[in-house]
From Swiss-Prot:
The gene is mutL. It comes from Heliobacterium modesticaldum (strain ATCC 51547 / Ice1). Keywords: DNA damage, DNA repair. This is DNA mismatch repair protein MutL. Belongs to the DNA mismatch repair MutL/HexB family. Coiled coil: none annotated. One of its GO terms (cellular component) is mismatch repair complex.
Length: 660
């Protein structure tokens, strides 16, 4: 007798079920897709023990006739396709005819279904693959699928299931993802005796996203919509750069209404966010991509969660450019990090001050005196002797004596703007600024001020328009790394390296990109050699064009060594190797878009040319840096995405000190 034998039907069904039914969430996904394909507008899901004991899904879809109900549990029986060619143009979520027979093989399955034109419903019951006679019963139009005792006949698989809580969470994740894709469908999830999730089903995407992700994120969402010449459509919402996560769990792609995992598309979105997010953080988005069905392959993965495109690179470029354009056109407001957002202690809230009117008047007098003294140089920590005047002496005396009482510390924001030229006048008196800051000051970039948006609910909780930074008064340095500045009722902490990095990046972008968008290069008098690993060398040789876009001209020098003959204009001397490795690392991570590479090159140049942490800055240099920040278009991070601003509100300080 031969070694190879034909397996019996029961074993074949068990193997097939293992490919489709991995856990309760797999069943929920398959059954929900069937309900959506049936045109349901309301779907109710009930779970017991996370789906291990019971999964019940009730929909108001089209239902099935008695003959179809009996046939639907046969393997590879489906209404979605008729021949192999249909696989390349399938527009439904399900099409293989594997889900129901696979579920029936490892559970106790009951299907009750009725069409609206039928007088009675049909009930199909199967226990572990064993069929029972078909029954005629009474039921409303639609379909109810009940799955009990999952893996009751395969205890070896049942023991690998996780806790009821973990399995229930996985089921809920499947439900809210489909709810986000189908805002016109009302989903409800009941676990135990409580409804844990419900979507409105009113075809309003923002209300659906609010139900799924929480109302607090809505103000950070940016609507996105674009149509490519090929007819591709991209729509949905992306998070502003201030809304980011420590993993990719909140990245949701729906291609032709199907939730998928797509590395190439997610990478395209992340490339668009390059330089806007801190390291190790990922953007939030819910995006819908509509393509002709024949241009994608949805049958390339056992669970249909991964797809293939016939023009993958073009789709990725379309996605990246659309997201980048949306980010660039967002309102120029700066959501700032607040001290309150980092705390979780139980200190009592500060009571409302009883002397607000008096303090406002006193504080405003103190504030105006401080501005005038700063303009005259009296508050600058320099040893230069300044000419005295009776008026200025009186103001200094009032400030130092504390005659204004609490108003000195509790002055309120005035409706009058701080003159934007006061810092500039102080800068003109001092010639000891750092060269890089002075060069950026000479550009005379225009100030920008963004008017508040009409829809209050769409604004960030904390906002700062670009021109407001010009009103800040530098106080000093902390640990030679952070600039302390005051403005209005707020104390600001500025990371000097990250802030200067952003300033230099802005200047480099305008100064060193030629008309073709390529970083201008300068030949090195003495070329620099750099030795690479075999993998790095191979990657560098395959990316010669991208390196040239970044301003680097290299050639092979033997073995795994390259010769750097030219670098971008403005790169500080001695930074050639480090800059080259920065760009090569970006290329090795898969960044191939030329615009992204150019941005990475400018980011590296700005980082290497910026003032470093631990470096002493004069009062004039701090003021110069704040003035340059005021000229930026509402950006609150360094080019690598790290925030450079932290605010401490006056009331937060009062709460910390238990002021009443």
């Amino acid at each position: 007798m031969g070694v190879i034998q034909r397996l019996d039907t029961h074993t074949v069904n068990q193997i097939a079920a293992g490919e489709v039914v991995e856990r309760p969430a797999s069943i929920v996904k398959e059954l929900l897709e069937n309900a959506l394909d049936a045109g349901a507008t309301r779907i109710d899901i009930t779970l017991a023990e996370g789906g291990k004991k019971l999964i019940r899904i009730i929909d108001n879809g089209c239902g099935m006739a008695a003959d179809d109900a009996e046939l639907c549990v046969e393997r590879h029986a489906t209404s979605k396709i008729r021949r192999a060619e249909d696989l390349m143009a399938v527009q439904t979520l399900g099409f293989r005819g594997e889900a129901l027979p696979s579920i029936a093989a490892v559970s106790r399955l009951v299907i009750t279904t009725r069409r609206s034109i039928d007088n009675q419903a049909t009930r199909v019951r199967i226990d572990g693959g064993e069929r029972y006679p078909i029954e005629a019963v009474g039921a409303p139009p639609g379909t109810t699928v009940q799955v009990e005792d999952l893996f009751f006949n395969t205890p070896a698989r049942r023991k690998f299931l996780r806790s009821a809580t973990a399995e229930g969470s996985a089921c809920a994740e499947v439900i809210w993802r489909l709810a986000a894709a189908y805002p016109h469908v009302a989903f409800s999830l009941t676990q135990g005796k409580q409804i844990s999730f419900r979507s409105p089903g009113n075809n309003k995407p923002l209300e659906t996203l609010s139900a799924v992700f929480g109302r607090e994120i809505i103000s950070f969402l940016l609507p996105l919509s674009a149509v490519a010449p090929d007819g591709w459509t991209l729509r949905g919402f992306i998070g502003s750069p201030s809304l980011h996560r420590n993993n990719r769990n909140h990245q949701n792609w729906f291609v032709n209404q199907r939730w998928v995992r797509c590395r190439i598309l997610s990478q395209a979105v992340e490339e668009a966010y390059h330089g806007m997010l801190p390291g190790g953080r990922f953007p939030f988005f819910v995006l819908h991509l509509e393509l002709p069905p024949q241009t994608i392959d949805v049958n390339s993965h056992p669970t249909k969660q991964e797809i293939k495109f016939d023009r993958e690179r073009d789709v990725a470029d379309f996605t990246r450019q659309t997201v980048l354009q949306t980010l660039r056109s967002r309102p120029l407001s700066r959501p700032l990090w607040s001290l309150a957002s980092f705390q979780s202690d139980g200190a009592p809230p500060t009571q409302q001050l009883s002397s607000d009117v008096r303090e406002k008047a006193e504080g405003e007098r103190w504030r105006q005196d401080r501005i005038l003294l700063y303009r005259e140089g009296a508050l600058s920590p320099t040893k230069q002797e300044l000419p005295k005047s009776p008026e200025r002496s009186e103001r200094v005396e009032r400030l130092n004596s504390g005659d204004f009482g609490q108003g000195r510390a509790l002055y309120r924001e005035s409706s009058q703007e701080l003159p934007t030229d006061c810092l500039r006048e102080s800068l003109e008196e001092t010639e000891s600024q750092s060269e890089s800051i002075r060069q950026c000051l000479s550009e005379n970039l225009p100030l920008h001020r963004q008017e508040p948006r009409a829809e209050k609910e769409c604004q960030p909780v904390e906002g700062l328009v670009a021109g407001d930074v010009a009103e800040w008064i530098p106080i000093g340095q902390f640990r030679r790394s952070y600039i302390l500045a005051e403005g209005g009722d707020t104390l600001y902490l500025v990371d000097q390296h990250a802030a200067h990095e952003r300033v230099l990046y802005h200047g480099l972008k305008e100064r060193y990109l030629n008309e073709a968008g390529v970083c201008a290069s300068q030949q090195l008098l003495l070329p620099v050699t750099v030795t690479l690993t075999p993998a790095e060398f191979q990657g560098a040789m395959e990316a010669i064009a991208e390196l040239r876009d970044a301003g680097l001209i290299v050639e092979h020098f033997g073995g795994n060594t390259l010769l750097i003959r030219a670098v971008p204009v403005g790169l500080p001397p001695g930074e050639e190797k480090g800059f080259f490795r920065d760009i090569l690392n970006s290329l090795m991570k898969g960044l191939r878009d030329r615009e992204v590479i150019r941005r990475a090159a400018l980011s590296s140049m700005a980082c290497r040319g910026a003032v470093k942490a631990g470096q002493v800055m004069s009062h004039a240099e701090m003021g110069a840096l704040l003035q340059q920040l005021a000229r930026l278009e509402g950006v609150d991070t360094c080019p690598h995405g790290r925030p450079y601003l932290l605010r401490i509100d006056r009331r937060e300080l009062e709460r910390r000190f238990y002021r009443s």
